[in-house]
Amino acid sequence: MTTAYDSGIQKLWVLNVGDIKPAEYQIELFMDMAWDIHSVRKQGITKHLSHFLQREFGNQLGKRLLPLMKEHYRLAYIRKPEFMGNTREEEYHTNDYRIIKDMPWSEKYIDTRLAAYQKLEDEVETCFNKVIPERQDAYFQLVKYPLQASAEMNKKILYAQKARHGLESWSKSDAAFDSIASLTRIYNIGFHNNSKWHRMMDFQPRRLPVFEPVDHKAATSPIIKERKYIAKWNGADCTNGDYSPCEGLGYEEKAITIPKNKSVNYTFDAINTDSVEIEVHLLPCHPIEGKSIRIALSLDGQQIPASNYETYGPVSYTHLRAHETSAHL
C-alpha cells in the first residue's frame, strides 16, 4: 500500500472485507495506513504489530507474542496453508486436477519447517495458559487458532508427503486433520462468548481437496534432493550498494528493493571452474511503470544480458503461491 500511495493512489483505497475473521489485525493495519500512512511508515510494521498485541493482551504477553506472530507470517510467506496442496483450482483441464502433489522441497527442508511449526505451536499453547479468562476468546481467534491451525495444516500435508515416500506413518497426517477440525469447533463455540461466532469459521471451504484428509497413495517419483550452492545470500547480505530493506518480506525477512539503474554487490571465494549458474529469486509482480521489470547482473566485471522477470499467465500463479519468481543465468 505504501507503493500505491507513493505512486499517487492517495484518494481512495477499496478493501474487500468479505472474510473479516481472522483478519482483524490486517484490516486494522490497512485502515491505519489509509488514515495516516506517514505514522505507520515511521514506526514500521513490526512496531505497529507490537502495539496491537500489547493493547489486546497486555504489555508482557504482547511482547512475548510478537516474535511468534512474526515467525507465523514468515512461514506463511514461504507458503500459505491454503496453498500447501501444490495444486490450483483453475487447472481443471489437466490430468492432475485437484490432486494433492508434493511440495518442491527436500526431506531436510520439510523436517526443518515441521520443527519450526512445532516450536511455534508449543509456545502459543504456553502463552494461552497466561491469558486472563475474559481475553481467552480474543486470544484464541487472533493468535491461537491462526497459528496452530496453520501448523496442523503443514503437518497434514508434509507428513503425508513423507508418508507417500515411505518416510513417515500416515497416522501423523490423519491426526493433524483431526486437530484442525477440533480447533475449528472451539473457534465456533468459544469459551466465554456464548458462541458469538458460531459457524463463522469453516475448515473445509468449498470442500477443496487441500482441506480434506490426504489420500493414502504412494509416490511415483522420488522426493527432491537438497540443492548445494557455492554461495548463498539474502538480499540484505550484500557487501555494499544502493538499496532499501523491505520489512517483513523475503523467506528470511531480508528482502531488499533496488532503485532503477542502481546496484548491489556480493562476494564469494574464487573457484576453479569454467562456468557457474546464478539463480536470483525475486518478488513476483507487475511493472508499476513501463512494460517490463528487468534485472541485469555482472560477474567479475563481465556483463550478463538483462532479464525481464515480469510474471504473467499461468506460470504467474505458481510464482504467487510461492511468493517468488526466479531467474537462472
Predicted regions span which residues?
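Short, surface-exposed beta-strand/strand-loop-strand elements in extracellular ectodomains
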Residues: 290-301
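A short beta-turn/strand-edge loop motif at beta-sheet boundaries
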Residues: 274, 286-290
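Solvent-exposed serine/threonine-rich low-complexity stretches and specific carbohydrate-binding patches
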Residues: 304-314
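Bimodal feature
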Residues: 262-263, 312-317
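Substrate-binding groove of N-acetylhexosamine-processing glycoside hydrolases
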Residues: 1-264, 268, 272-279
